[in-house]
Amino acid sequence: MRATLEISLYPLLQKNKEEEYKKIVKKFLSDISKKEGLVIESNGLSSIVYGDYKDIILLLQEEVRDYLKKYRSVFVFKIGKGTLSYSNK
């Protein structure tokens, strides 16, 4: 089954590292863009991930878990069935 995930990462302030959040977000985007079978579009507010449902869930299980262990952060997700893109009419 095809699915679409909207994901946002909000790193919480790291002690004495005010600009660190930009590096954390850019690293996360770089890491998830390496996943095969997924198409990722990013903007200033969130990223949209298109792909097979099982691959998207695997991304959540692996990458999100790792970032939550490593950084104080909050993730916001929305997931829906199909390729939910206005450009795919």
What are these regions (language model features)?
Residues 1-89:
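Charge-rich, low-complexity N-terminal segments
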